Amino acid sequence: MSTDHRINNQAGFILHTYPFKETSVVAEVFSREHGRVALIARGARRPASALRGLVQPFTPLLLSWFGKSELKTLHGAEWQGGLIAPQGRALMCGFYLNELMLRLLARGDAHQALYDAYVLTLTQLAEASPDMFEQILRRFEKTLLIETGYAATFDKEAGSGETVRAEWTYVYQPERGPWRAAEDQRGPWRAKEDQRGPWHANGNARGPEGVSVSGKTLLHLAADNFDDLTTLAEAKPLMRALINHYLGAKPLYTRQLLRELTELNEPT
């Protein structure tokens, strides 16, 4: 009986590669059925290697591997086609998605809904005009946070469980969700006066750490509605704060590149 734990013909994408020894690479893979997996592609850096042109990001593949350790061995890769590779700014957005998943996904945890969302997002980035990229990225960020268990609910108040109201302002806290801001709020950080617990603000104390956001935007996020311009404007700092909370101190490299690219393209 075979004991090498062979996995065959799994749909997946390469998120990132780095050199391994003289002629090989380690490929960080996101597969539909097995989640994130690290695979050694032996000889993939040789000019004549059949893997050389396949072990690339944004290429839909059928992957086969074996091994019992965390670092497994790739023994087959087949191009599936059917996906237009992103170009230009869309390509940078694609690398941003890959870096997010490398940083936030644990190895070996399957996320089939996230995989499907990733394929859809790559397709949309390749086909959409640049003015749609913000909407596309915010939707994927939300899906990633929910699928990995990092995002609390958007349409229910933390603590009370009451439905968020569009006309009210909230402070969204990572790991907790939205807290209603005070009706006489002096700024976006003042907490509702009847709140108690570690996030309660009284006297001159600062309110709960979080991001000020309208109830309307929270309801739109819960409904996966990113068509409203105000929702897009408020969703960006909210998603960034949530992602940064879980990333820790190390910033995203691709986010900085996207920022610099935007600045270069702005009229002077």
Go through each PLM region and give its residues:
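Non-catalytic alpha-helical scaffolds and adjoining flexible linkers that form interface surfaces
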Residues: M1-V26, F30-T268
